[in-house]
């Protein structure tokens, strides 16, 4: 094998290692059976959420996972494999892919990684049911606001009762 081909392969592996290291979550999927239109739509939805979808040879993925120090992903790198990398939102790739797989039965989630730890299929599916980061923050905010709101209503009720003339 020529030196240039080996260098190109090493560069691809290094690029994938960098994506592994920068990602907060990764979802590995089997896209066999999807039409071009379906893959294009999936890529579009992922891109809108800031998630990159890559189709890389399984050999390169195995080498990159080993080089990045992620053991346990090798079993997911079989057959036609696509990988979704998210650098910001942990929930986004799992949620988008799980929702998309409801309409495209051929799409199959194989596994992934969540914040540096290898995740099983069940963990990825559980993650997909969670609200997004913004949704979780709004829930937290409403929980924090509830006691303050109740105190404000109580103070207003007391003030209103003092304003009413005695009967």
From Swiss-Prot:
Signal peptide positions (record): none
Pfam families in alphabetical order: Ribosomal_L10
Annotated TM spans: none
GO CC, one annotated term: large ribosomal subunit
Gene3D superfamilies registered for this protein in UniProt: 3.30.70.1730, 6.10.250.290
Keywords for the protein's UniProt record, in alphabetical order: Ribonucleoprotein, Ribosomal protein, RNA-binding, rRNA-binding
GO molecular function per UniProt: large ribosomal subunit rRNA binding; structural constituent of ribosome
Domain of life of the native organism: Bacteria
GO biological process entries: translation
Family named by the database record: Belongs to the universal ribosomal protein uL10 family.
Function description: Forms part of the ribosomal stalk, playing a central role in the interaction of the ribosome with GTP-bound translation factors.
Quaternary structure, from the entry: Part of the ribosomal stalk of the 50S ribosomal subunit. The N-terminus interacts with L11 and the large rRNA to form the base of the stalk. The C-terminus forms an elongated spine to which L12 dimers bind in a sequential fashion forming a multimeric L10(L12)X complex.
NCBIfam families noted in UniProt: PRK00099.1-1 (NF000955)
Name of protein: Large ribosomal subunit protein uL10
Organism whose genome encodes this protein: Latilactobacillus sakei subsp. sakei (strain 23K)
């Amino acid at each position: 094998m020529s030196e240039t081909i080996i260098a190109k392969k090493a560069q691809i592996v290094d690029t994938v290692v960098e994506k592994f290291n920068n990602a907060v979550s990764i979802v590995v999927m089997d896209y066999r059976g999807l039409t071009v239109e379906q893959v294009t739509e999936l890529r579009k939805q992922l891109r809108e959420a800031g998630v990159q979808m890559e189709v890389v040879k399984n050999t390169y993925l195995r080498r990159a996972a080993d080089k990045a120090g992620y053991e346990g992903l090798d079993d997911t790198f079989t057959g036609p494999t696509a990988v979704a990398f998210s650098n910001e939102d942990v929930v986004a790739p799992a949620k988008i892919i799980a929702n998309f797989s409801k309409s495209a039965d051929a799409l199959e989630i194989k596994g992934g990684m969540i914040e540096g730890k290898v995740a099983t299929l069940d963990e990825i599916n559980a993650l997909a049911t969670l609200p997004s980061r913004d949704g979780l923050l709004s829930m937290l905010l409403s929980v924090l606001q509830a006691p303050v709101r109740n105190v404000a209503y109580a103070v207003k009720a007391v003030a209103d009762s003092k304003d009413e003339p005695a009967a």
